[in-house]
From Swiss-Prot:
Sequence similarity: Belongs to the alpha-IPM synthase/homocitrate synthase family.
Protein name per Swiss-Prot or TrEMBL: Homocitrate synthase AksA
UniProt source species: Methanosarcina mazei (strain ATCC BAA-159 / DSM 3647 / Goe1 / Go1 / JCM 11833 / OCM 88)
Claim: Metal-binding is one of the keywords in the record: no
Enzyme Commission numbers on file: 2.3.3.14, 2.3.3.-
Matching InterPro entries: AIPM/Hcit_synth_CS, Aldolase_TIM, LeuA/HCS_post-cat, PYR_CT
Pathway(s) where this gene product acts: Organic acid metabolism; 2-oxosuberate biosynthesis
Record domain Pyruvate carboxyltransferase: where: 23-274
One Pfam family this sequence matches: HCS_D2
Length: 405
């Protein structure tokens, strides 16, 4: 099956005027994802996740925040020396000691961040904008003088005056030739329209690649990330299973599949998404919700009779993309909403064949059982019902066996 047969392309994009995407992914699961309350990854776990991200074709991996602890620093360094194709990045405050730690870790990119919003300047730093920007410039100069590529990140950018961001970014671009400037929607206040405006304004003001880092406090992190890409953002930040501070970050699995379906970007190995999701779920102790896009338990689970009957003929009738595209599996469930045609297809798929009268009897048993138990039935339960129906439909004068589950 060709790539194009695995999903339905959003052909309405052909009528939308947007800038062709020039993007790369920076996955921040190992740093921002680990800031999820209660989550601590071991060295072996971080190495395993980094290896999977690299094998998928993720361009940049943010491995951690070296000054957090000696163990963190050791892990970041080990990841940086694995020989991955992915470039390795780490976080740094606008402090010389943090940059020294990054240098000792052998990373490719250091992300030096400050906040420039009035909120953070007043209540977090208790310092002026000039002071904080001066600290950032000193750290950036020190990093570039020592051969590091630099991403200058504006924390809380979405609550910072746009003209202030433009001025700061232009200054570091002109003075230090940084590789990236980054916009962080730290509290998830943006929507796709305001994201497009913010990124477009910065795009018109600088020649440096723009990064977008979205949080999901209003459930729009993935949509905002795509809006940023359309407006000219180069580097898109994600986490596996959307884990992260508070409500989490833009979801890697959602962003990669959306890039394929919406924009035809197919270079990432999306077949690893489900196994990577399961890995991070195991390591973090956080299971994605059952209706989570792409990797949730119900993402490819169908019960409605109309849906199942159509899927048995052509899965794309009710699936935007096939489960195989993301390493998942389809699950056809027998329940209250299952119709005869769908039920016949399901029982045939598990090796049973029923006459019309038997099928009618089975559908009635299925509906009674599911309504009594308030849930769908398992395959074992279905097979038991099939056996009961076959026994009851035998031409015999014996009393019909009462069915039970």
């Amino acid at each position: 099956m060709s790539e194009s047969e695995q999903y339905s392309r959003n052909t309405l994009m052909d009528f939308i005027d947007y800038r062709p995407l020039d993007i790369e992914i920076c996955d921040v699961t190992l740093r921002d994802g680990e800031q999820t309350p209660g989550v601590v990854f071991s060295k072996e776990q971080k190495l395993a996740v980094a290896s999977e991200l690299d094998s998928m074709g993720i361009e940049v991996i943010e491995a951690g925040f070296p000054v957090v602890s000696a163990d963190e620093k050791e892990i970041v360094k080990e990841i940086a020396n694995q020989g991955f194709n992915s470039r390795i990045c780490c976080l740094s405050r606008a402090v010389k000691g943090d940059v020294d730690a990054a240098l000792e870790c052998d990373v490719d990119i250091v992300s030096i961040f400050i906040a420039m919003s009035d909120m953070h300047l007043k209540y977090k730093y208790h310092r002026s904008l000039e002071d904080m920007l001066g600290c950032a410039k000193e750290a950036i100069e020190y990093a570039t003088d020592h051969g590091l590529k630099v991403r200058f990140a504006a924390e809380d950018a979405s609550r910072t005056p746009v003209e202030r961001l433009k001025q700061a970014f232009k200054e570091v671009e002109n003075e230090y030739k940084v590789q990236y400037v980054s916009l962080a929607d730290t509290v998830g206040i943006l929507n796709p329209t305001t994201t497009n405006y913010l990124v477009s304004e910065i795009f018109k003001s600088v020649n440096t690649a723009i990064c977008i880092h979205c949080h999901d406090d209003l459930g729009m992190a993935t949509a905002n990330t795509l809006a940023a890409a359309e407006a000219g953002a180069k580097q898109l930040h994600t986490t596996v299973n959307a884990i992260g501070e508070r409500a989490g970050n833009a979801s890697l699995e959602e962003v990669l599949v959306a890039l394929r379906v919406q924009y035809g970007i197919e270079r990432y190995d999306t077949t690893k998404l489900n196994s990577l999701s399961e890995m991070v779920s195991e390591y973090s102790g956080i299971t994605p919700s059952v209706n989570k896009a792409v990797v949730g338990k119900n993402a490819f689970t169908h019960e409605s009779g109309i849906h199942v009957a159509a899927i048995l003929e052509e899965p794309r009738t009710y699936e935007l993309f096939l489960p195989e595209m993301v390493g998942g599996k389809r699950n056809l469930v027998v329940g209250k909403h299952t119709g005869k045609k769908a039920l016949k297809g399901i029982i045939n798929s598990i090796g049973f064949c029923l006459e019309r009268e038997e099928l009618c009897a089975l559908i009635e048993k299925v509906k009674v059982c599911t309504e009594e138990k308030h849930k769908s039935i398992s395959r074992d339960q279905l097979e038991r019902l099939i056996t009961q129906v076959k026994q009851e439909q035998k031409p015999s004068g014996s009393e019909k066996e009462k069915f039970s589950i």
